[in-house]
Design a protein with these regions (language model features):
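Hinge/cleft segment of the Venus flytrap/periplasmic-binding protein
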Residues: 9-14, 107-151
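Hydrophobic alpha-helical segments within soluble ligand-binding/sensing domains
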Residues: 2-9, 31-36, 59, 84-88, ...
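Short beta-strand elements at the ligand-binding edges of bilobed clamshell
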Residues: 23, 94-106
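Hydrophobic alpha-helical
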Residues: 7, 21-22, 26-89
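Conserved functional loop/turn residues at catalytic and ligand-binding sites
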Residues: 15, 44, 96
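Class I S-adenosyl-L-methionine
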Residues: 5-15, 63, 67, 93, ...
């Protein structure tokens, strides 16, 4: 997914050495992510340093698996998610989730409506809306951490 791709490319551009140990789909589900993480913990153990989850439920599933495996807060991999859901915000406060990303839901809705109206009436994207590769419109995201809970 683009979220993971851009997260990893940002680390590489910053000079962080990376090694991808594993990747799998968990269909945005906490339970499925927990199953995958349990498998990886058996396979890779403490070699897992970072988990990029493409939504908060999957990040929480990874945390569940780590907790079940007996990992304390200080032993957890660096786990991040996306969406800034209430359960993820609680995990941030507890110190089990390192960060999440808040989507701009209002901006997304406004962009979708603007795009739909413009495409249906004019056949082109709205003026001023930048479209990448003919398919993508980039929206604002906010990093959320325990130190910056408001993003």
């Amino acid at each position: 997914l683009l979220r993971t791709e851009y997260s990893i490319s940002t680390l590489i551009k910053a000079g962080v050495s990376t090694e991808k140990l594993a990747s799998a789909a968990a269909n945005w589900q906490r339970g499925q992510a927990g199953i995958r993480m349990r498998q990886w913990l058996r396979e890779f153990g403490d070699a897992i340093e970072v988990v990029f989850a493409n939504n908060d439920d999957m990040a929480l599933g990874a945390i569940d698996a780590c907790t079940e495996a007996g990992l304390g807060k200080s032993s957890l991999p660096f786990i991040v998610g996306v969406d800034a859901t209430p359960p993820a915000m609680e995990a941030l406060r507890e110190g089990t989730l390192e960060g999440t990303v808040r989507n701009d839901a209002v901006g997304l809705a406004e962009s979708l409506i603007s795009m739909a109206v413009s495409l249906s009436s004019e056949g082109t994207p709205p003026q001023g809306m930048e479209v990448t590769d003919g398919s993508y419109v980039w929206l604002r995201y906010e990093a959320v951490t325990a130190e910056q809970p408001e993003g």
